[in-house]
Swiss-Prot record:
Catalytic function, reaction form: L-methionine + ATP + H2O = S-adenosyl-L-methionine + phosphate + diphosphate
Binding site for Mg(2+): 24
A Pfam family: S-AdoMet_synt_C
CDD domains listed in its UniProt record: S-AdoMet_synt
The organism of origin for this protein: Synechocystis sp. (strain ATCC 27184 / PCC 6803 / Kazusa)
Compartment list: Cytoplasm
The entry's keywords: ATP-binding, Cytoplasm, Magnesium, Metal-binding, Nucleotide-binding, One-carbon metabolism, Potassium, Transferase
Protein name per Swiss-Prot or TrEMBL: S-adenosylmethionine synthase
Cofactor: Mg(2+); K(+)
Amino acid sequence: MRGLKTLSKRYLFTSESVTEGHPDKVCDQISDTILDALLTLDPNSRVAAETVVNTGLTLVTGEITSQAHINFVELIRQKIAEIGYTNADNGYSANSCAVMLAIDEQSPDISQGVTAAQEQRHALSDDELDKIGAGDQGLMFGYACNETPELMPLPISLAHRIALRLSEVRKSGQLAYLRPDGKTQVSILYEDGSPVAIDTILISTQHDEHIGDITDNDAVQAKIKADLWDVVVGHCFSDIALKPTDKTRFIVNPTGKFVVGGPQGDAGLTGRKIIVDTYGGYSRHGGGAFSGKDPTKVDRSAAYAARYVAKNIVAAGLADKCEVQVSYAIGVARPVSVLIDTFGTGKVDEEKLLEVVLANFELRPAGIIQSLNLRNLPAERGGRFYQDVAAYGHFGRNDLDLPWEYTDKVDVLKAAFASSPQAVAV
């Protein structure tokens, strides 16, 4: 993280996550469920699906151009039920909420630049990978560091673990009184840039008003806190060397109660959890969201490619931390700029590193789509792929098989510098 270079030797850093039942995450998953269905039937679908939820209402809007025909309403209701909203008494349920659609086709002005990039339109290149132009202008970041085995910052990694565990114990019935909505937050104490202690763990989780015969709210909250410590937190730290201690603050439902939640408690919108989706604030963000967007949208595909580059650099031992920025112009295939920053942790010259990356990684939209197989994954995975990364983070997911998490370029990177010893930094 760039900012950490100027901080004192001892500091706290905090990241948060949310469960799949958080209103914004409900929207992300609905948008990506639609994307999965369309790409499964027509891999060339152009999709920009935005979802809004509120009490008793689901609205899907945006622009879609596809040869596929899908039952939007049925897909939406199935996803809402899968998340866990099946009780109309909670103000939002799969079978009783209104579902509204307001969908247009992709603008022809945008489409012409995506279908035929500037390089093709102006006969600047006959390379097949120069055919597809970026779906929009913008800047995207990818990041990796060696704080965890999955090469992610520790705060967001732990926040995701805890959020995912909340869902697991709810769905399994182990803590049947939990409801779908929830948020987690973890503060880590760093010394000299390395995590040394778990300072604070915060969990806000929606729950039934009563737990069995426990009706007093103070007693309900006490039970929730005890259960979460034993069943959720304890499990999440079982295989991690850095564990909570008696000095770790453990905060649960600090408002005192969390019965009303989900879309009844807060309106939700696709693309409002972009920091949760990425690196928890540990790295910079270009501002573009992922969910509901087909792979021609570089907000999504280029962010995946940038993570792929950064992770392979760190996995190859060429840096302890690495951030990759890439930027695009709409309708142009080749990136406007590419930047690699190792924040003083690099073991090789950064200019040489950039040369090696540009020679071995594909950063044109068509090349990213091809190398990471982004159009075909939904069909190859039984009709669902993007909806599964829409909650609990798009990066560092050891529970999913994600092409941008592969470290298959490590040997190529090592070989490039093994043959160029003068590139090694001193």
